[in-house]
Amino acid sequence: MRRYVRRGAALLGAGAAAVALVIGAGPGGAEPAAATGSLKMVALGDSSAAGPLVGTQSSLDCLRSTSNWPAVAARALGAQLIDVTCSGATTADLTGRRFGYIAPQLDAVTADTDIVTVAIGANDINMGGTVLGCTQPLPEPLGVSCKSWMTALGDTTDAQLAAVRPKIVDAVNRIHTRAPGAAVHLVGYLRYWDETGCYPTDPIWTVDAQWLQSIFDRTNAMLRRAAEESGATYIDIATPSTGHGVCAPYASKWVEGFIPTSAAAPYHPNQSGMDAAGALVASAIGR
């Protein structure tokens, strides 16, 4: 039995408290969080976890925030955090050196690790470039839908994601080898759009917003399947974030649009989103 399981009762209380709180209210290497509990948590992943431009940045190379959701979750769980999330990271950066000098993210996982969170996959299919490529200076029917020209030869999203899944499964298997007692959690992406876009407040047409959200949905489905295949746990943060996306009112927005209304990179979680995601992750880990 994993050592992590024996601490489940304490984690459950911490996770529940974190959710109640949120709903009610240097170099690119590893960054320890303030929490120094007996649990050791390692966070791997891309900008969805790193938090570019949110609060204080601990790494300019990786645009990593000290108040991102891994930090929020670690504090709620009373865990010591080693955060190696990095904006722009792909699955290749789990085992290879990003920019040629940032250590492979998996190097942060050691035999005494209790919890590992992994939030990655979207950059493998160039999701950031796809979203930005869908911004439109002109309203419908002027201009051209990005979906129409990006899928002119067919929508290759599913094939691309099918190629990413075994890479994530392999990464989780490597984590199990490096830290046999660790619980591994694959964390999905927040929901960006609901049924419609909100042009011109955000310059993406509804037809394209719906298509982009379908890609996020399919990415999350891929992560869920990868978790099932590798003995990890999938954490869904998309469903609870419905109504908090790009088009939400300022006070309830968790994800910023093309022109951020609070500190965050375009089309990335803001601090409210990081706080909410951190609480959701802590609650899921504590179950």
Please provide the spans of the model-predicted regions:
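N-terminal export and membrane-targeting signals
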Residues: 1-16, 31-34, 160-164
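C-terminal region of N-terminal signal peptides and the immediate post-cleavage residues
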Residues: 12, 19-40
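Serine-esterase "nucleophile elbow" of acetyl-processing enzymes
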Residues: 33-88, 106-107, 135-140
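Structural recognition of the beta-strand scaffold that forms the well-ordered cores
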Residues: 40-45, 49, 81-85, 114-119, ...
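Oxyanion-hole/transition-state-stabilizing segment in secreted/luminal serine hydrolases
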Residues: 52-54, 99-160
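Conserved N-terminal glycine/acidic-rich loop preference
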Residues: 115-118, 140-178, 185, 190-234
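Short, solvent-exposed beta-strand-terminating loops
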Residues: 121-137, 188-195, 239-246
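Catalytic His-Asp segment of secreted/periplasmic serine-dependent ester chemistry enzymes
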Residues: 190-287
